[in-house]
Amino acid sequence: MTNWFNKLLLFYFFIWPPLTTSEQSDLNDQRPPENRFDGEFLDLDFDEFDEEPSWRDNFVIRVSHQIFGQVNSHQVEPIPDFKIHKSASIENHRTGINVRYQNAIAPGWLIQGSWQGRIYWKEDYEYEANNNRIEDEYRINEIFVQRSTQGQSFRLGRQTVVWGETVGNSVLDVINHNEFRDFTIIDVEDTRLNQWMLLWDVFDKESSWSTFINLYPEFNPRPIRGGPFDFDLGYEINPVDRGNDPIFEIGSQWRRSYGSSDISVMAAYLYENQLRYERPIFPSDKANPVKNDYILIGFSANRAVRKLLLTLDVAMKRGVLIDGSTFVGVGSYNTPTNVKKDQVGISLGFEYGITNYQTVSLGVQLKKMKDERAGLSEEQVLSNQGVYGSWLFRYGNRLKNDDLELSLTLQGDLEGEAALLAGNAAYKINDNWTAGLQILTIHTNGTSELQYYKSDVRLGAALAYSF
């Protein structure tokens, strides 16, 4: 653990950006993308607020109902000679309400927040995990107050900070933690969880400096009880021990525009979002989660060439733990929790506007650990060796005057052992009603950790009312 003196030096380094006296041209363009509601797979556009003064104008409310399940009865063999029959079943049967609030309470002042509630009905995995009783859940997703002045902006509250240029697959998108609950949410943009932060932006005509401070870092939550990613480990897990030393995260990013290009340089002191776990010695004991702090140095750039946007992200991490399980939200139980390494990661991508209504993008992420075998015994096997990573392909099309939106997502690992295909369609019936369909299938080869989901086919439908 980095000692307190080093943390204090890092705090001083990150919090003191260069001064500027130029006016801010457009504060809204500098804001990071808003965290989407958990469980949403419809790409819905909220109506603009009415200009007439009314308390109701500051709210947007959406009520939705969703059914989603695995429809292909088949057999899988996650372990050699161990076969499991999988029957078609409903996984998600739930009603949701999402509330978004935004109010410019005074010149230069903004309050924004979002809240969600869920009711889990019969056949939903959370209903079954709750002893076959209706379950409900409520939480605040985002809430912050922002103060904007000439050339500066301060924002305090639960929010997200996103670094990197490669959409959906950037090695720099590591600040906020994530939660993959089930297969209705596969895009990283939809999985980011808000954290309590102070964000300070300083703007110049062609450049900006952004600094964040997180005084209570959080970690990727364990898979939801009863969900498709929840497996019986044979023992319980202790809560995170934050210890007596202060735990915080801090980072800064400098960004500059050069005509059709942008470059960014960033540095941060962070905690790994994914915990590792120490396997208990006795079955009656609980596993202890291991948190780890590290230093991130990054660089990103983009270049626009007519309808084509090229992106590059580079991340150098010093003092990260060995990558173990690649399974979402699970972490690792079989790799050492006391061996730190340095890692280099690169993301390459492009986005292309085929027409005003069609877009396509591709992002590739590559990682490499330095001296990955150093400090390990011959018996210890690494899940990821050499250069490893993932790829992500997306296609989007808007039809019928934007009333029908179609999207296709393909993603997999570089080794070719696993691939996921998802298709979505959202139809705007009128100004209030929207209907959506989703299909998702998984294909695996070799020793992929997704063998349990091999040949799964999932279908879903949702109906939403917004006002």
Predicted regions and their residues:
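Repeated loop/turn-to-beta-strand initiation elements of outer-membrane beta-barrel proteins
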Residues: 59, 107-111, 151-154, 206-209, ...
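N-terminal periplasmic/intermembrane-space "pro-region" immediately following the signal or transit peptide
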Residues: 16-90, 96, 100, 187, ...
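Detector for outer-membrane/organellar transmembrane beta-barrel domains
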Residues: 66, 270, 299-411
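Transmembrane beta-barrel strands of outer-membrane/channel proteins
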Residues: 61-71, 113-119, 156-158, 211-215, ...
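Outer membrane beta-barrel
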Residues: 102-227, 259, 444
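Extracellular loop and loop/strand-boundary signature of outer-membrane beta-barrel proteins
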Residues: 81-87, 126-133, 182-186, 235-240, ...
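Outer-membrane beta-barrel "beta-signal"
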Residues: 395, 439-441, 454-467
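Hydrophobic, lipid-facing positions within transmembrane beta-strands of outer-membrane proteins
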Residues: 93-99, 138-143, 194-198, 248-252, ...
